[in-house]
Amino acid sequence: SGVIRAESNSFEIELTQLLSLGERRFYANIHSMNHPGGELRGQFVPAEASAVFRANLSGNHAVPVSVSEATGTAMAEIYGDTLMIVSGTFGDLDSPVETIGNRPGLFAGLAGESGGFVFPINTTLGEGGLEGEIEASNNVFLLNEGQRMELYRRGLYINLATADQTNGALRGQLAPESQIFMHGFMSGTLAVPASSSKGYGNILAELNENKLTISGSYQDIDGSPGGARLHMGYAGSTGEQLFVVTTVGELIEAEENAFDLSEDQLTALMGRQIYFNLPSSAQSAGEVRAQLLPEATAYFVSTLSGASQTEVVNTDAYGQAILEYTNGVTTVTGSFSGLDSDFNLNAAGGAHLYDAYAGSSGEIVQRLNVVLGEGSQSGIFAAEDNNFNMEDADVTSLFDRGQYIS
């Protein structure tokens, strides 16, 4: 910890730097031994702002989801009840930003919803239209009362469509500044047992100290929805109920869903061990499910079964793993259970990430570390044990669906 004292931090700045400061291009960065690139960062905005909202721009938030290495961040400053100024950057898009038809804009809708157009977002694009800036001076808006209420309920989002992703390649939900943002994508694939539901949805989770606030929505559930809950458990397993989630129709409102976490629950959340589950009349155990995960560039899910082996294995064993990818770094979490014999640690460690398409066998990319359960026929992939760097060729293969876990 430390303090930044005024007498030790007084600087003269040039006119160009002053202009950059006014455009919100100045930020403070705190470096640490574990995070040499920076562990804490803060963008400078005028002190008169009554509130600051942030949107992490990602294809994960788009509806439907867009899988790419594109990223971005936007901020919205609020002055009084009506004035909003938006700024930020984005990059690494696969195709140019749409600037005429589906131009960048601010839309109304909770996470997981597609909503109506509110304001155009003016961008200054780089070469090829694959990156750009959202300049503060070009994005000043006056909110009416309804728009202001939407903002504070997490009901406004930024959407950037591209030539190849006309519905949206990058999307970010505006939410109040928080210590940590997390994301959950709802799918029947993540349910235990897996569901063939066409339902989908998204959850935005904000963590401040021990207060967890969630918001979002779900769509196209096959049955009549039952009681939504937050549970304890890794991907691929089920666990105890923690909190009742209040829903209004298909919406999850932030003001109705703020929870105080115990120290154990906080540790579990950071370890990817808390999930949202929505049972229905069609799937009483859960029609769609979402694991709460730290913000990442992309997420990949691997459902583990004997049927997926190149030579099918008839087994009741089941499991699931989720891989988070950001800037060449991956984290794998999940679980498996029901093996019909003991886990074979002597098989070069027993669990690995391989490089090959479905139906074929490939080379080992990375050993996965397993914490075995009682009896050695079940186990978990803990986040702290399965964090590793990826070579560029392996990243390309991953995004091409060319990797599997065995």
Pin down the residues of each PLM region.
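Metal-centered catalytic cores of metalloenzymes
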Residues: S1-A228, M232-A351, D355-S406
